[in-house]
A protein has these predicted regions:
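Outer-membrane beta-barrel channel domains
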Residues: 20-163
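Bacterial Sec-dependent N-terminal signal peptides
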Residues: 1-25
Length: 163
């Protein structure tokens, strides 16, 4: 409930100070399986044959500010191969608030980051593999010139619906 109030207050705050009209954007994705017995593969379907992962993302942009939230549902059970932490759960998975100006980019909440080819740090999401190791914290990117970016991050890795 506290997360929902935070999101509503962020959206309300950006709407009340608006000089121009912002816009909403987002998407919905649903991955569903209906499991059946397969004697050729010697596979017995589990009792809960229907499994579904659903993601609803809603973002709002107003000038230099962007706010977003992603709601996730793993009902009645998560797809096979997913962590058991997700089974039967639904909740707000990620949320963020971003401010971007000429040389500064500040993000608070959940974000993804990769340095180079990802050997030092790589946080990313691949829904088909069940990977979402977003960082929850703050990220500041300062770009003083076209060829130099200074990035500072602080946060904890997402694990299920927790950090």
């Amino acid at each position: 409930m506290k997360k929902l109030l935070l999101i509503v207050s962020i959206f309300y705050g950006t709407l009340t100070f608006a000089q121009d009209k912002g816009y909403f954007f987002g998407g919905f994705e649903s991955n569903t399986q209906w499991l059946l017995n397969d004697e050729g593969l010697n596979f017995d379907a589990p009792k809960d044959q229907l499994r579904s992962n659903n993601y609803f993302r809603l973002d709002y942009n107003l000038g230099k500010l962007t706010a977003g939230v992603q709601y996730e549902s793993y009902l009645p059970s998560a797809l096979l191969g997913y962590s058991p932490k997700f089974d039967g759960n639904n909740d707000i998975g990620t949320y963020y608030l971003n401010f971007k100006h000429n040389t500064i980019d500040i993000t608070a909440g959940y974000f993804y980051q990769q340095f180079g080819n990802g050997l030092i740090l790589r946080s990313w999401e691949d829904r088909q593999l069940g990977i979402n190791n977003a960082l929850k914290g703050i990220r500041v990117i300062f770009t003083p010139t076209d060829y130099l970016d200074l990035t500072g991050i602080y946060g904890k890795t997402r694990n299920g619906f927790d950090v």
